[in-house]
Structures are given as C-alpha cells and as structure tokens.
C-alpha cells in the first residue's frame, strides 16, 4: 500500500520512479537533442574529428549532463521538480530552434531582446518548424514528465539526497574539466561563441545575470544630466528655428548601402540628393536593446555597460535646453530612451500603409505637421528635434518591410526560416528593405525642404546595428559584441543639412564630405547632436563631436 503523504511504512511497496531517474533522463535528453546547435557547431569546426575529437565530445557531453543534474538537484523537491523540468525542457526546445535555425547564441543581451519582443516580431519568428521543434523537443517530453509518477520521500531524506546529487554532479564536472582541460580550454579560447550554445545553461546564466543587475545598478535612481544646458548664440542671430529629424535606423548594415560602395543601386534617391554618408561608422551594440539606450547616452559604450546608476540622455538635455522633442515610433518602442519626452506611435488603423498590425515607414510622414503643432508652443517656436524610429530592415521577415513598388531585386526570400532560402533570395529581400529606406529618407528630406521657409532644417540617419545574412552561417544579429562579425556592427550614418542649417551651425556639407572616411561611433552621437543644435552644456565634449572639425563659429 502506498503512503501518498510522502513517507512509506515498513513492508509497504513504493510506487513511482525515484526523482533522480527523471533528472537523469531529462539531463541526457537536453544534453543530446536539446543541444543540436552545439553539436552541429562542434562538428563544423572539426572539433569532433579523430580520437581526440571524440574524447572532447564525450567530455563535453558528460559535462553538460553533470551541470544539468546539479542544477536540477537544487530544484528536486516534490513541489518544484516537475515544473522545473517542464520549464527547462520547453526553454531548451526554444533555444534549440533559434540557435539551430538562425545560428544565433543566447546571452544576456539576446534574452533581453526576447523578453522585449512585441507580438508582431514574435509572429515573424514562428512557423511550422518552430512549432514542430517545441512540440517534439519540449512539450512531448514535458507531458511524459507529468505522466511519470515520482516516488514520495521524506523531506530530510530528499534534502540529503539532493545535496549528494549536487555535490556529486559538480565533482564529476570538475573531474571532466581537469581531465580535458587542454583541449577544452583551447576550444573555448579559439571559438568563444561555443560557450553560448550550451543549452539551456546559457539561458539560465543569462537570466541570472539579468536578475543580478539590480544588485550592480540601482534602477530606482535616475541622475540628472546637463542641467546647465542652454541654447547657444545662433538662436538669437537666426530668425528661423531649427528643425532636425534624427532617424534611428533599424538593422541596416553599411555594406548594403550603395552610397558606401555597394555594387547594387540600393540608394539612388539619396545619391541624387548629394547627402553625406560616413562610411566608417560603428554601433555600440548588436541589438536594439543594447544600442538604443547606449547611443543616446553621454557615457560611451564602455562606461554605459558598466554604469552603476541610470542617467538622463540626449533627449532630456535637448528638452532641458528649452527645445521641443518628439519621439515617433514605428517599431517596438524606445527602450526607455523617450520615457521623459513626448512620444507617439506612428500606426494609424485602417491606413493603406498598414496591414497585419504593422505599417510601412512612410506612415511616419503622414500628419507630421499636426503632430509637431501639438507640441508645447513655447518650446516649438525655439526649435524642434524629431526622432523617428522606423521598422527599417527588421528581420527575419524582410519581405514584409518593403512595399511591392520597391521590390527591385527578385526573387526574394519570403520565409522566416532564412536558411531555407538561397543566399541570393535572402540578399534580394534585404536589399529591397534598403531600397525602401532610401525612399523613406529621401521623402523625409523632401518634407524638410518644403519647410525651409519656416525653419532651418536638417536630417541625421544612423542605424542601431547591422545584420548577418548567412555569412559564416550566421543570421540576424545580437551576437556578443566581442565576437560579433563586423556586418553586425558596421552601420550607415548619413547627414543632410539645408543651406539655412549650414549657416546657423557653421557646418557645411562640403566640409563634411572631406570627413566621410573618418571613424565615427555611436559614442559620437550625443555630442554631435548637441553641436548641431547649438546646445551648450558642461557635458558636451567637442572632441567627440563629429561635426566640430567643420564648424565655423
């Protein structure tokens, strides 16, 4: 007779499996099929070749099982074991799909991207392969876990056995590391991205880092910035106020811009407008979640990543100087960059430019005068900084980002499983997004030109990060910065100044054209925008103002 209260009397039969039996099978399942992306990468790197490679593979397999067993040993309690196994199995299946399909890795930044994904972006990532992988590798094993009876144990006995499992598994892991130290350390040193493929330990580590951030950074504190900011003398000298549009591009890579030497004519409209394109521009992150807050910060990439408190940003300083600021979004939000300035979503339900919950970027030009007119009159008459956050080239559904009229390069990839398309189809779909971005930016400049009688107008465009299009079997973006390929970090940066803005800023397009090969980074954006808008503050650093070399007082 079974005692279901958690103890068994003498002579009673014990029903169900020991908890460690479930843990062992789950650890083996996740270490093998749940790490398909890891095993594929090790094979493609020829790290599993020969007897030495097989030994390394066996060591990595045992190490994965041991670490997973140690993790599960901490959770092997009656109320938590099956929920924990379910979460890890489903997480492992999700990780397998994305790492195997898109060749991405899962670190804290990538997990942040996942947590901030909106429904539209999530839909683009789902398909038959997604659901099949989650079902076969996650949900069906989870059902098996719940259908398997587990032997009840006294709390004291369970605690002792759990402790023994954790210590034994860690001892086994340490033994494997010591025994395989030379080949293992060599593999990790020469192929640093491999460590981010250990599934689902990579997600557990990433979530742990995210959970620890409040201990490293006081999120409740927001330090004021540039409280001494004032408008410079140009505001008294020039009758017309400045109107600057800052377009924060999405997932555009410099290599595919015709302006930057790309063989295809992806940017003919901008080329005809004689804009200045800075060809050596670099992002401070490889994802929107990392780059967007960083590029609006005065700290620069290194200091921003290690900051202990949050600090106000460029938009706060501009607004504090008495200017009107508006954030217009056709994307997934501003990542708190616009938290203290007016912000609006560009989408207009029922508009022909919108379908399926998404809009083409030209929607941001519709009703723009009315949006600006609604800003505070006193600030608006002094000057306006309008930040546009377009959909741009956001993947993997590149084919959704360009209207039919701008699909110049065909056939294009129409799948969200990019590896299912040929390289040419994938590049065609991406290049069509750049062609549409070209048209959108040219249309924005045309809108600005039409208002030159009332304002001194300018446009600055810079992308948040780049994109991988199958080079080295990598897709999308978000690799850790230290190991990310240049195509995920090298971004387009374009400036256009009207003649009126040239006069008020003392910066000429002719001079800027002499600087197009100078290296610039997102670290320059904060100071360059203050310089263009003639906002004086102690936080401004002239050496980081990319336009300062051309500015004539």
Set out the residue ranges of the language-model regions.
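Catalytic domains that recognize anionic headgroups
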Residues: 2-16, 20-22, 34-133, 139-553
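Charged, amphipathic alpha-helical stretches
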Residues: 23-31
């Amino acid at each position: 007779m079974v005692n279901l209260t958690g103890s068994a009397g003498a002579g009673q039969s014990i029903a169900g499996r020991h908890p460690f039996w479930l843990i062992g099978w789950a650890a083996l399942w996740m270490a093998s099929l749940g790490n398909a992306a890891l095993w594929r990468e090790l094979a493609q790197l020829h790290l599993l070749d020969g007897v030495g490679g097989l030994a390394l593979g066996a060591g990595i397999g045992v190490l994965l099982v041991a670490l997973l067993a140690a993790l599960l040993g901490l959770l092997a309690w009656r109320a938590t074991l099956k929920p924990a196994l379910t979460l890890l199995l489903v997480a492992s299946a999700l990780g397998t799909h994305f790492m195997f399909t898109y060749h991405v890795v899962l670190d804290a930044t990538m997990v942040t991207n996942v947590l901030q994904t909106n429904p539209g972006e999530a839909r683009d990532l789902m398909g038959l392969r997604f659901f099949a992988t989650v079902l076969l590798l996650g949900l069906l094993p989870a059902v098996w876990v719940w259908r398997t009876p587990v032997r009840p144990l006294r709390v004291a006995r369970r605690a002792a056995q759990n402790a023994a499992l954790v210590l034994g598994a860690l001892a086994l892991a340490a033994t494997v590391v010591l025994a395989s130290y030379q080949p293992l350390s060599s593999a990790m040193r020469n192929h640093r991205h491999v460590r981010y493929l250990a599934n689902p330990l990579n997600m557990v580590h990433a979530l742990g880092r995210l959970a620890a951030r409040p201990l490293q950074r006081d999120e409740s504190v927001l330090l004021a910035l540039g409280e001494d900011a004032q408008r410079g003398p140009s505001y008294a000298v020039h009758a017309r106020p400045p109107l600057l549009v800052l377009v924060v591009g999405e997932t555009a890579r410099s290599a595919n811009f015709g302006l930057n030497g790309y063989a295809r004519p992806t940017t003919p409209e901008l080329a005809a407008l004689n804009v200045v394109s800075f060809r050596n521009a670099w992002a401070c992150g490889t994802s929107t979640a990392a780059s967007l807050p960083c590029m609006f910060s005065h700290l620069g990439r290194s200091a921003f990543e290690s900051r202990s408190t949050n600090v106000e940003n460029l938009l706060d300083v501009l607004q504090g100087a008495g200017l009107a600021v508006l954030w217009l979004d056709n994307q997934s939000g501003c990542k708190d960059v616009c938290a203290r300035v007016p912000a609006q979503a560009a989408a207009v339900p029922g508009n022909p430019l919108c379908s399926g919950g998404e809009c083409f970027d030209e929607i941001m030009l519709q009703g723009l005068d009315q949006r600006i007119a609604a800003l505070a009159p006193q600030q608006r008459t002094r000057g306006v900084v309008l930040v546009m956050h377009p959909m741009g080239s956001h993947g993997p559904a590149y084919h959704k980002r360009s209207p039919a009229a701008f699909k110049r390069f065909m056939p294009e990839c129409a799948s969200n499983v990019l590896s299912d398309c040929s390289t040419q189809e994938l590049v065609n779909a991406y290049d069509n997004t750049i062609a549409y971005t070209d048209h959108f930016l040219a249309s924005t400049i045309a809108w600005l030109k039409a208002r030159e009688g009332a304002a001194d107008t300018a446009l600055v465009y810079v992308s948040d990060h780049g994109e991988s299009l199958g080079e080295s079997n990598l897709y999308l973006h978000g690799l850790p910065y230290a190991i990310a390929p240049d195509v995920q970090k090298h971004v387009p940066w374009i400036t256009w100044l009207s003649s009126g803005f040239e006069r008020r800023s003392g910066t000429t397009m002719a001079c800027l054209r002499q600087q197009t090969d100078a290296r610039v980074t997102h670290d320059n954006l904060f100071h360059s925008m203050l310089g263009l808008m003639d906002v004086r503050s102690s936080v401004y650093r002239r050496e980081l103002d990319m336009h300062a070399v051309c500015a004539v007082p």
